[in-house]
A protein has these predicted regions:
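A conserved ligand/cofactor-binding region detector
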Residues: 1-165, 176, 183-295
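An amphipathic, hydrophobic-aromatic interaction surface with interspersed Lys/Arg
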Residues: 171-178
Length: 295
């Protein structure tokens, strides 16, 4: 990789360091088939973008509970959705951060596929090999089918995560996506099995770290190669091997980038400890107000 190009990337203020390494450099170096960036959350100032959108739609959202007639309610929801999507176009897709991500994707010879998760949350998948697109698009299409099925006939027994992300409980889908994203086979299989059994993967991974620390074991951060990745166990040899290989290649590219990645790996382990708390905070926004008042 051209040193001047790398220096420019590292100085880019509109792309977060984690995105530079995990989402751009790893696919560019052929170390990951596909990477994923959630926007605007993984943009510098992403939270502020979301707040600006929310502020614009808040007056309309506040009126929704007062609309009781079914046809009027449906129309009000559609208007709200349109407002959210227009807000995303203006504040996210019109931002320097968005333009910088796509500019760097092009400059590094990478390709991308953008997928809407919610009106104000999109995922950008980044890859080098053109042949990957077919598998990726097929997976995203299957995800849409699973979500439409759940939304068309909601099951009152489903929890918040099952309703919002039904694909997370479809083992075959998880395994296909996990392999595309470069996760070790053993960790993908454990994740899929846990989800199918109703095990809270985030809590399981956090508890594994806590129990290891209680038992006097030293935590091996090298088992956590990526953010929001949950290894099958805290000392997983396969995920540790991934970190060792990736860090070696990044150090060969530039010692500073290798050191940056080392810091990220340590932060990944800490984020696993916090993940159950973060998910609960996210899901709480979907709770009916009367449930919140009881807590």
């Amino acid at each position: 990789m051209d040193k001047h190009l790398l220096d420019e990337l590292l100085k880019e203020e509109n792309v977060l360091p984690r995105v530079k390494v995990e989402a751009l450099l790893l696919p560019h170096l052929g170390l990951r088939r596909v990477s994923q960036v959630t926007i605007p959350a993984e943009f510098p100032g992403g939270a502020e973008m979301g707040q600006r959108i929310d502020e614009k739609v808040q007056p309309h959202m506040a009126k929704l509970p007062t609309v009781t007639e079914p046809a009027a309610k449906l129309m009000a929801v559609r208007v709200l959705k349109d407002m959210l999507e227009k807000g995303f176009e203006e504040h996210v897709e019109g931002s320097p951060q968005y333009k910088a991500l796509y500019a760097w994707t092009d400059r590094l010879g990478l390709k991308s596929e953008q997928s809407k998760v919610r009106p104000t949350v999109h995922e950008v998948y980044i890859f080098k090999d053109r042949a990957v697109r077919k598998d990726l698009v097929g997976l995203l299409r299957d995800r849409e089918k699973l979500r439409h099925k759940v939304q068309r006939k909601p099951d009152p027994k489903l929890g918040g995560i099952q309703f919002a992300y039904p694909e997370e409980f479809e083992p075959s889908w998880i395994k296909r996506m996990g392999r595309l994203l470069g996760y070790p086979e053993c960790c993908v299989d454990r994740y899929a099995e846990d989800r199918a059994k109703g095990v809270n993967v985030e809590a399981r991974a956090a508890n594994q770290l806590i129990e290891a620390a209680k038992g006097g074991e030293s935590i091996n951060p090298h088992a956590y190669p990526l953010g929001y990745f949950f290894p099958c166990r805290p000392d997983c040899p396969a995920s540790t091997a991934v970190v060792i290989e990736w860090r070696k290649r990044l150090e060969e590219l530039d010692p500073g980038v290798g050191a940056m990645y080392g810091d990220m790996v340590r932060a990944n382990a800490y984020m696993v400890l916090r993940q159950p708390e973060l998910i609960q905070r996210y899901l709480s926004q979907f709770q009916p107000k009367e449930q919140e008042d009881k807590q």
